[in-house]
Amino acid sequence: MIDKYVIEEIDRGIKETWENEIVNDYYNGYLLKEDSLKCSLYFHLRTKLKKLLKENNLRIYPEYYFSDLRYFADIAIVQIDTTIDKSYLRDKIVDVIAVMELKYDGGNSIGTENAIKNDILKIKNYIQTGQLLCQYYFAVIYETECISLNWLDKRSTNNWAQGYVTELNAGSLDGDMWFEVNPYNGMNG
């Protein structure tokens, strides 16, 4: 079991990365689609959290597969036990600390919104099955004019998302691109 302080430091690192490095990468033309967002988050989180990751046997993996749930997480932060005598690294993973689902789109079609909403349902399923009790980060860059940057409604944020989910949002409001963090997890708000 990982110490709460470590979880809070990871949470702080993810939120700061979104508000600083991801914003800079976006405005400097380093982010084109979801995969470049994933690469950027991976790079910046490994850099920012390097010491914490090493001290706590934590690893960051893209496209991490949860076989029991039959889902791929875009990014997962996991803890490994290096003393386990197994051939496969996957068998040394003892805890999941954080899961990130990412979306990056410039379209405003119903299909785009449905893909985003499907990731919300994926996170909801992770939480409601109780098989994966960790922190969840839903990161969306939506290059379309928005009324609001939030994707979760009050019913979600007051129920299943409370204590677990943080939205990392970006979208256009009145013609300007905005980035924000909406934490429902009670940490580093």
Predicted regions and their residues:
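Charged, often low-complexity linker/regulatory segments
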Residues: 1-44
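Domain-level recognition of nuclease-like catalytic cores that cleave nucleotide substrates
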Residues: 128-189
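Active-site metal-binding core of divalent-cation-utilizing nuclease and nuclease-like domains
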Residues: 54-92
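Conserved catalytic cores of phosphodiester-cleaving nucleases, focusing on short active-site segments
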Residues: 75-77, 94-106, 123
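Short, well-structured hydrophobic secondary-structure segments
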Residues: 32, 36-58, 66-71
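Active-site-adjacent loop/helix micro-motif of nuclease/hydrolase catalytic cores
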Residues: 84-87, 107-121
